[in-house]
């Protein structure tokens, strides 16, 4: 089975558990960014976390996770939507941090002082909902759990794991999201809490047993129902038209100056690294469009 997510619910309706495998898409995204080993692990955790939270969205909604801190990575953005599409960008893909007690030092490469901002486009045409919390550990999973408890008042446990092969490429990547829903049976909640504490290392568990084994261990003696298994995939969504709209926002004067002085412009997507080239004639045409649009908007404003 390729990258996927499984949504499940206890028979009592009080415990929701999601598990995911994002190894393939994480490997591709790390390749596109030329990510260092430690950044690859950070990206893997971020992508797994984004996929898990994206699975909670309603149709037509999307979210963005922005981690900003004082480490050499500086910033990581993960976006996910209700269809199962995810993408990510990092400010400094080659950043590194010395291992800490034999483990990947994700907190060291991201930075221990910083913030997590979650933006949700609810598909209603208004401003996105946004919530911000301080990073509590900079290990990604704990920070997402803290956000869910603090900003969305949903007690949650998030476990994320990733591992590299001998060539330094992602070989395993995934995780789980456990949430206690209103009216949860305390005995069931305590059993699942104990199950989480008893889990073997997550990357080893995913490698040997996959998401199904992870799900079984999380519920263990708690009866549950699998609600859905959904494909996850990397999709950027950028395109030349979107880049043109971004350039138009610069205004006619700046675009004309770029066309006459620079003679060209190259715009690279921060998520998929696709480059879009614009020559002098194309920049001048965009400048004329931007100028005409501004004149039209000013005229419309005067008519009101």
Curated annotation (Swiss-Prot):
Transmembrane annotation, as ranges: none
Gene3D superfamilies linked: Hsp33 domain, HSP33 redox switch-like
Location of the protein in the cell: Cytoplasm
GO-annotated biological processes: protein refolding
Post-translational modification: Under oxidizing conditions two disulfide bonds are formed involving the reactive cysteines. Under reducing conditions zinc is bound to the reactive cysteines and the protein is inactive.
GO molecular function: protein folding chaperone; unfolded protein binding
GO cellular component: cytoplasm
Keywords: Chaperone, Cytoplasm, Disulfide bond, Redox-active center, Zinc
Reported function: Redox regulated molecular chaperone. Protects both thermally unfolding and oxidatively damaged proteins from irreversible aggregation. Plays an important role in the bacterial defense system toward oxidative stress.
Family (UniProt): Belongs to the HSP33 family.
Protein name: 33 kDa chaperonin
Organism: Pelobacter propionicus (strain DSM 2379 / NBRC 103807 / OttBd1)
Gene: hslO
């Amino acid at each position: 089975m390729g990258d996927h997510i499984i949504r499940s619910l206890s028979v009592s309706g009080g415990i929701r558990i999601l598990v995911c495998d994002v190894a393939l898409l994480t490997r591709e995204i790390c390749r596109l960014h030329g990510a260092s080993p430690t950044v690859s692990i950070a990206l893997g955790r971020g992508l797994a976390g984004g996929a898990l939270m994206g699975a909670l969205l309603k149709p037509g909604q999307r979210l963005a996770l922005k981690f900003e801190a004082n480490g050499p990575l500086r910033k990581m953005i993960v976006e996910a939507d209700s269809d199962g599409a995810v993408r990510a960008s990092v400010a400094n893909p080659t950043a590194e941090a010395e291992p800490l007690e034999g483990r990947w030092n994700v907190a060291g490469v991201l930075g221990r002082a910083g913030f997590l901002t979650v933006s949700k486009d609810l598909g209603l045409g208004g401003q996105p909902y946004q919530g911000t919390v301080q990073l509590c550990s900079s290990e990604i999973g704990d920070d997402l759990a803290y956000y869910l408890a603090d900003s969305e008042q949903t007690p949650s446990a998030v476990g994320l794991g990733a591992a590299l092969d001998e060539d330094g490429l992602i070989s395993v990547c995934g995780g789980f999201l456990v949430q206690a829903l209103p009216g949860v049976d305390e005995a069931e909640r305590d059993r699942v809490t104990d199950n989480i504490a008893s889990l073997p290392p997550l990357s080893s568990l995913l490698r040997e047993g996959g998401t199904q084994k992870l799900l079984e261990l999380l519920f263990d003696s708690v009866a549950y129902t699998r609600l859905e298994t959904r494909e996850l995939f990397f999709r950027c969504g950028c395109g030349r038209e979107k880049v043109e709209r971004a350039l138009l926002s610069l205004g006619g004067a700046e675009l004309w100056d770029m066309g006459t002085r620079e003679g060209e412009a190259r715009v690279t997507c921060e998520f998929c690294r696709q480059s879009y080239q614009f020559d002098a004639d194309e920049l001048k045409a965009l400048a004329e469009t931007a100028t005409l649009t501004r004149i039209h908007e000013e005229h419309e404003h005067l008519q009101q």
